[in-house]
Amino acid sequence: VYVACSSLCFSRYPLADALHAISELRFHKVDLALHESGSHLKPSDVVADMNRVAQMLRKANVAYAAFHVQIEAPDAEKYRDTLRAVCRLGRVLAVPLVNIPAAPLGADLSEEVTRLTSLTRIAQAEGVILTVETHSQSMTADVAGAAELCRRVPGLGLTLDPSHYMVGSGPCQDYDPLFPFVRHVRLRDTTSNSLQVKVGKGQVEYGRIISQLYRERYQRALSVDIRDTFEPEGPMEPEVRKLKYLLESMV
């Protein structure tokens, strides 16, 4: 198990500066966001010229633990073509895993199983693992729903973002049943009122999460994912460093 850093920690920087900041903090791997509405790389950039994007990412002198992907496409076919290009980029850069969002809350389960089965095959053809993230606004908002998707879609994994099971008026959801499906993890500190708080001010049980992952023989990334869009008042580096050191002391 190793600690990686999300490029979303530094989304206010140009991408080259963000990757440099992550490298300066002595992370060896980056959880790279490719969001169509984001300020860094977009999936459409990859479709337009994959070789140019690959060259640019190689120049940064960091390795990539995962791609965190949000595609905006007019139809299912265009979505598949875009995902295929991103997965191909993953193969070229030896990125093991590509994450996408599951369908929004309230979507039809069998339709989503069909969609994700097709997308998982695309990823597998390029030699990468496809995951969906646990998120309060998607079908994975409910632990049972997330587990059901993974059971019904062969080869699909989960990116565990435990914050989304902690926020809200009800008690924190027990997400232990999901650990067998987890292929990637994103962490920040969280309370029931706020998705992101300063490290040490929240209730995320990092030690328990790590011991559950070890039980499943997990050997992948724990990604520091503190968004600079949440807490604009302070510099990001001290917070990111604090969580990095905390996680490294546990693995």
Where are these regions (language model features)?
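Flexible loop residues that form catalytic
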Residues: 35, 72, 103, 190, ...
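Residue-level recognition of beta-strand->loop/alpha-helix junctions
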Residues: 7-9, 33-34, 68, 102
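Glycine-rich, proline-tolerant flexible connector loops at the mouths of alpha/beta enzymes
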Residues: 31-54, 105-106
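Metal-dependent catalytic neighborhoods of phosphoester/phosphodiester hydrolases
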Residues: 41-47, 76-80, 110, 233-234
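Active-site acidic/histidine proton-transfer and metal-coordination neighborhood
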Residues: 16-17, 56-63, 69-160, 166-167
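Histidine-acidic metal/acid-base catalytic patches
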Residues: 1-7, 12-28, 51-54, 58-61, ...
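A generic secondary-structure micro-motif detector
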Residues: 8, 42-43, 76, 109, ...
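Active-site loop signature of alpha/beta-hydrolase-fold enzymes
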Residues: 35-38, 137, 165, 193
